[in-house]
């Protein structure tokens, strides 16, 4: 019987893993610059966390979660997103008492959603995200957006569009909610079952419907921006002002609501405008969630964050034809001829590795020509050739693979020589 990976998953082979490692390095380095610290949470959580944290009217909760019962009869769910788990940890570990507010965290790891696999979309996917908890300053909204944009820019992406919106505070959303109900109610029967169910539970989510997005009532739906009270409007204006100060271009789209129930005030998405990227252009999404900490059992605490898919990021890089500057080769391949030379090669390779030099040798008992081909396939910068004659003379031949330049080096100084030429 032959086995294949489950639908919606992928194997990340070594040549691809190098790209992932580079992206992860860039993300971590930017988090260091922005003073965000890493947090790691379990891959599965109690199902109730996502029902309360993500929202029971969302597609994620209703259609996409991988939920199971453990042997103790507890309902557990593979995490479909990262924010709810980070906030749960923030509350459980009483991080709201940290004197260094806001608490700035980032996470990276696999998420799971049962959705239709397509280009750049998988049922197991890796998210990178940040959360800033404890500040109501619109400047941190702009900082979070700037961090997301910086990740894409450092990787070379240029064809990007930032879209922002305000979902307002509780008072603003209440007024807008009633306006949406009044707008859609007379013809709600023309909409899909999901929209009909959302009309009185969370009518703003109707605006996020993919099936009915071209319906004429969608185009004429009341704009949240017309229902913002003075406090919400002022907050949104300050976010825009800070983005302008940072030199970040953006568009305001009053129909942007995001797919999770916990957002309020600022909501944003970063999209790819690269040709041939596909119908789903969103690379990153985020926003403010001032009520989520309280919903999960903590004190009233403001928060804002974003999440991006590494798979979508890789697809965007491919669409723009961007190659990442990753090192594909090893520093030195030691070619050994004869039994005594093979024994010496083991020690030489170990000594190189101890000095931080990537090194390899033959383990297949291949001839010299085959060993040289192996070194070439590994993109070795140097090849060090050691035979019986070299052993008797106490030397080793070092060849630069790109230029063909060859040099005889004393075995006693070989390691220091390699450190010098590889600087």
Swiss-Prot record:
- Cite the record's note on assembly: Homodimer.
Keyword ATP-binding tagged: yes
Q: What are the GO BP annotations of this UniProt entry? A: histidyl-tRNA aminoacylation
Q: Which Gene3D superfamilies match?
A: Anticodon-binding domain (3.40.50.800), Bira Bifunctional Protein, Domain 2 (3.30.930.10)
- Record protein name field: Histidine--tRNA ligase
What's an example GO cellular component term for this entry?
A: cytoplasm
Per the record, the gene is: hisS
Stored InterPro entries: aa-tRNA-synth_II, aa-tRNA-synth_II/BPL/LPL, Anticodon-bd, Anticodon-bd_dom_sf, His-tRNA-ligase, HisRS-like_core, HisRS/HisZ, HisRS_anticodon
- NCBIfam families tied to this protein: hisS (TIGR00442)
Q: Name one Pfam family in it.
A: tRNA-synt_His
Q: Does the keyword Kinase apply?
A: no
